[in-house]
């Protein structure tokens, strides 16, 4: 959560969407070639790939790609290449066609949703370029019916309002909790997808209450809040939205303590014999949240439609909120902030 908090703090008023899981994956690749304090700092973000493999195998709407491009004139150690396999490729960074090739690869992989990835010519001094790309488009286990979607006011601030396409469902049972903390009160709800992932939406009681929640959004707190959820019949209203994210993570990670990882301070002597530096870490994301549902999910919603009369709660995301997409084992795959409908 620390990467999200840092990015959200530096981009106030903007939508944010990142994938901590894929960022950890590409940092793990760098860890394989690191030594000394560089390896020590990177070890904080090294995680097993097992969860990502499970998601990829069971949810065909999830795609992630991590790549490390190295300068063709550098000789990389076999021990390093053996650990990263197909995630590594040597290129000529001085050739303008290199950017086109990288962009084409990402474009095809993400079905045209992330293009272009690189928008500027790389420096001829570039030795290494690390990239993580992710595409996520999932179907709800319980669908939002399109006939219930309508224009609805979204409060960007207590004094500013814009209309959004608000998806609605009535009388369904979701895991839900109303949380009271010293830094603010909020609601949290779990909206499951088909497969093995779900979206957790954290909605402050106050229109302008998201900042304090963001500041206190730690892995420990998030797990505590999720453990407080209980099955509740509830009306749900959430905006229909698309969000893209584009970040160079170097400055963010340096602020978080990875001071010996980038530029000339990085020790990658386990990667190659010559001096190399990580000059950029590009992270682009895309998410599409809409009413889409599978036939099986639609049948499920019909089975409980007669419960609408028992609803005593309402979850209406008509002001800025945080959303977290996680695997059933608790691993966080994505985290985002939705606060600016006009930038969709």
Swiss-Prot record:
CDD domains: serpinN_SPI-1_SPI-2. Belongs to the serpin family. Poxviruses subfamily. The gene is OPG199. It comes from Variola virus (isolate Human/India/Ind3/1967) (VARV). The keyword Heme does not apply. Viral serpin that inhibits both cysteine and serine proteinases involved in the regulation of host inflammatory and apoptosis processes. Major anti-apoptotic protein which inhibits both intrinsic and extrinsic pathways and strongly cleaves host CASP1 and CASP8 but is a rather poor inhibitor of host CASP3. Prevents the proteolytic activity of host interleukin-1-beta converting enzyme (ICE) and ICE-like enzymes. Can also block apoptosis through host tumor necrosis factor (TNF) receptor. Keywords: Host cytoplasm, Host-virus interaction, Inhibition of host caspases by virus, Modulation of host cell apoptosis by virus, Protease inhibitor, Serine protease inhibitor. InterPro entries: Serpin_CS, Serpin_dom, Serpin_fam, Serpin_sf, Serpin_sf_1, Serpin_sf_2. The record marks 306-307 as: Reactive bond. It is found in: Host cytoplasm. This is Serine proteinase inhibitor 2. SMART domains: SERPIN. The keyword RNA-binding does not apply. GO terms for cellular component: extracellular space; host cell cytoplasm. Pfam families: Serpin. Its main location: host cell. One of its GO terms (biological process) is symbiont-mediated suppression of host apoptosis. One of its GO terms (molecular function) is serine-type endopeptidase inhibitor activity.
């Amino acid at each position: 959560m620390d990467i999200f908090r840092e990015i959200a703090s530096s981009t106030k008023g903007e939508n944010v969407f990142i994938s901590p899981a894929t960022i950890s994956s590409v940092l793990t690749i760098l860890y394989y070639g690191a030594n000394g304090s560089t390896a020590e700092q990177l070890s904080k973000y090294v995680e097993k790939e097992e969860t990502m493999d499970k998601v990829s195998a069971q949810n065909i709407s999830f795609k992630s790609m991590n790549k490390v491009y190295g300068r063709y004139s550098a000789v990389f150690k076999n021990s390093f290449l053996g650990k990263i396999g197909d995630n590594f490729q040597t290129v000529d960074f001085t050739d303008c066609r290199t950017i086109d090739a990288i962009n084409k690869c990402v474009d095809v992989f993400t079905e045209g949703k992330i293009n272009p990835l690189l928008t500027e010519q790389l420096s001829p001094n570039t030795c290494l370029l690390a990239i993580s790309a992710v595409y996520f488009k999932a179907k709800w286990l319980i669908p939002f019916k399109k006939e219930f979607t309508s224009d609805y006011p979204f409060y960007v601030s207590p004094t500013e309002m814009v209309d959004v396409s608000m998806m609605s469902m009535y009388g369904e049972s979701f895991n839900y909790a109303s949380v009271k903390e010293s830094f603010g009160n909020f609601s949290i709800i779990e909206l499951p997808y088909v497969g093995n992932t779900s979206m957790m939406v954290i909605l402050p009681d106050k229109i302008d209450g998201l900042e304090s929640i963001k500041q206190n959004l730690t892995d420990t707190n998030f797990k505590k809040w999720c453990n407080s959820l209980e099955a509740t019949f509830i009306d749900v209203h959430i905006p229909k939205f698309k969000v893209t994210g584009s970040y160079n993570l170097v400055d963010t990670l340096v602020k978080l303590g990875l001071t010996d990882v980038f530029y000339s301070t990085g020790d990658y002597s386990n990667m190659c014999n010559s001096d190399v530096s990580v000059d950029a870490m590009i992270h682009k994301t895309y998410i599409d949240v809409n009413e889409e549902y599978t036939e099986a999910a639609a049948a499920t919603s019909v089975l409980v439609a007669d419960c609408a009369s028992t609803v005593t709660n309402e979850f209406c995301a008509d002001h800025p909120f945080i959303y977290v997409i996680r695997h059933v084992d608790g691993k966080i795959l994505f985290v985002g902030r939705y606060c600016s409908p006009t930038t969709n």
